[in-house]
Curated annotation (Swiss-Prot):
The lineage of its organism: Bacteria, Pseudomonadati, Pseudomonadota, Gammaproteobacteria, Enterobacterales. It is found in: Cytoplasm. SUPFAM superfamilies: Coiled-coil domain of nucleotide exchange factor GrpE, Head domain of nucleotide exchange factor GrpE. It comes from Escherichia coli O45:K1 (strain S88 / ExPEC). Belongs to the GrpE family. The gene is grpE. One of its GO terms (biological process) is protein folding. This is Protein GrpE.
């Protein structure tokens, strides 16, 4: 028998045994490399996770700051709007006694006397022009009667029995009230109707 013809006890040629062993080693190597994790890969994965977490925190922080800035901008706009709307409040409050004086002068003036007609007309025109000016700036007069009492714009001075006006409604105006852009700057002093006993 030659060396080529030599058979192993299992009946395989030596080349076949080497090939089989080589295939077994190749089959084992991928499993071994899958089980072995490179520490650099672990470190990279850990760093990537930390980076993602840091990016999320930064993104959240930026969004939070943007939201705070937007809220601050809105509040500032509202404050400026209110300042524009109600900047005249002090000035209007100083004018109200003048308007009241003109109203009282008209109430007590003797309109039947022809000698007083020019003065009454002058007071009426002065009052009208003053009210027109303050209306341009958002001031409205509260002087309606026979309307339900509204504690936001009326201050009840007295209750008076009445057949003509429903109970709880404004019967008379003692002093006119005023609003500035919808906000009451002086409530109207009124008498309120009540049912007769």
């Amino acid at each position: 028998m030659s060396s080529k013809e030599q058979k192993t006890p299992e009946g395989q040629a030596p080349e076949e045994i080497i090939m089989d062993q080589h295939e077994e080693i190749e089959a084992v190597e991928p499993e071994a490399s899958a089980e072995q994790v490179d520490p650099r890969d672990e470190k990279i994965a850990n760093l990537e996770a930390q980076l993602a977490e840091a990016q999320t925190r930064e993104r959240d922080g930026i969004l939070r700051v943007k939201a705070e800035m937007e809220n601050l901008r809105r509040r500032t706009e509202l404050d400026i709007e209110k300042a524009h709307k109600f900047a005249l409040e002090k000035f209007i409050n100083e004018l109200l006694p003048v308007i009241d004086s003109l109203d009282r002068a008209l109430e007590v003036a003797d309109k039947a006397n022809p000698d007083m007609s020019a003065m009454v007309e002058g007071i009426e025109l002065t009052l009208k022009s003053m009210l027109d000016v303050v209306r341009k700036f958002g001031v409205e007069v509260i002087a309606e009667t026979n309307v339900p009492l509204d504690p936001n714009v009326h201050q009840a001075i007295a209750m008076v029995e009445s057949d003509d006006v429903a109970p709880g409604n404004v019967l008379g105006i003692m002093q006119k009230g005023y609003t500035l852009n919808g906000r009451t700057i002086r409530a109207a002093m009124v008498t309120v109707a009540k049912a007769k006993d």
